[in-house]
Design a protein with these regions (language model features):
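Helix-biased detector of long, well-ordered alpha-helical tracts
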Residues: 1-182
Length: 182
């Protein structure tokens, strides 16, 4: 089975109670495209130094070869690269292919403040924006994977877990909402 982005589905599926780990930052790809293609409009709204710093930060993708190496060494662990559907699209794919639900804590999903500002400027949800360089990992030992990645200078954090039902729940300060297919 192939994803819309042409990436093959993960060979190992997530199972209920597996941790879901975010690696990298959401919507960096979208922010970079915006900085490249809408620079003139952005310069009217944001200071040049802010845009330059945003471009520098959003260009720092995690090393995919290190991520793949860590995942391959850990039994029952799967890697899900984000694509054009962003974080939410990747969460949908992970849960649909694995036939599990999820409980994901929105406030735990890593997204840069600069990216939030740029997405807000264009009225785009950063969790649905293109997110090359962002990955989800489903693992039975999430804390260990998170620790190994962080020790390798790769930003990673547990954002939730796979559930035994089919409910795809996003949990935030405002309560719970269901993830809808984009």
């Amino acid at each position: 089975m192939q994803r819309k982005t042409g990436l093959p589905e993960a060979e190992i599926k997530a199972k209920a109670s597996y941790d879901i780990i975010a690696v990298g930052f959401a919507a960096d790809e979208y922010a970079l495209d915006l900085l490249k293609n809408e620079n003139e409009k952005l310069n009217e709204r944001f200071p040049a130094h802010y845009l330059k710093e945003a471009q520098r930060l959003c260009s720092e993708y995690p090393d995919e070869s290190i991520i793949k190496s860590i995942v391959s060494k850990n039994h029952d662990t799967s890697l899900w690269p984000a694509g054009e559907g962003g974080v939410y699209g990747t969460l949908w794919w992970l849960t649909a292919v694995s036939s599990v639900g999820m409980r994901v804590f929105i406030d735990e999903i890593p997204v840069r403040q600069e990216t939030i500002q740029l997405c807000s400027f264009t009225d785009v949800d950063p969790y649905r924006a293109a997110s090359k360089g962002f990955y989800l990992i489903a693992a039975p030992n999430g804390k260990m994977i998170e620790s190994i990645l962080n020790e390798s200078d790769i930003p990673a954090c547990i954002i939730g877990y796979a559930a035994g039902d089919n409910d795809k729940l996003l949990i935030g300060k405002e309560g719970k909402q269901y993830l809808t297919k984009a």
